[in-house]
Amino acid sequence: AGVCSAVWADWYGFKMEAYDAIPENAALLQNAGACIIIHSDDENGIQRLNQEAAKAQADGRRIGINIPDETAIGWFTLNPAKAMGIDKFTGSLEKGKMADVVLWNGNPLSVYSRPEKVWIDGALLYDALDRKRRPVSDFELGQPGEGDVK
């Protein structure tokens, strides 16, 4: 108990270190008292750890293990900091700790929630309601559109 386990939510069988795992892994380990870390080694997956944690939480619920939202959020915030031995400095919102903060318009574990504001190193860098603080998509690169020089 108390040992941190870095697991995927449900990406199993796609390579050797994920060969024989199960989607209920995070919930079963949490239920046994382990420190769970939902992780990804993919540049896209790392951007959606909140959704990955929600999938693992739902897999636990399906087998009768109810993981509170606060615990599931800790799987990608506080627990990685614990595993690296830096939880006294980061990983949770507490006075004196370093943090980048995302303010969501709903439950951060919901696929329907979107970030409203993002602070990095104390500076507001993204604000969904402020056009100057929203990134411009390069999806239509080279085509006339928002953000292009006219």
What kind of region is each of these model predictions?
Residues 130, 139-150:
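Gram-negative outer-membrane assembly/targeting C-terminal domains
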Residues 57-58, 108-109, 143-147:
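Short alpha-helix boundary/capping motifs
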Residues 2-104, 124:
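His/Asp/Glu-enriched, well-ordered alpha-helical/loop segment
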Residues 20, 51, 118, 139-141:
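A generic membrane alpha-helix/interface feature
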Residues 82, 94-138:
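C-terminal cap of metal-dependent C-N hydrolases
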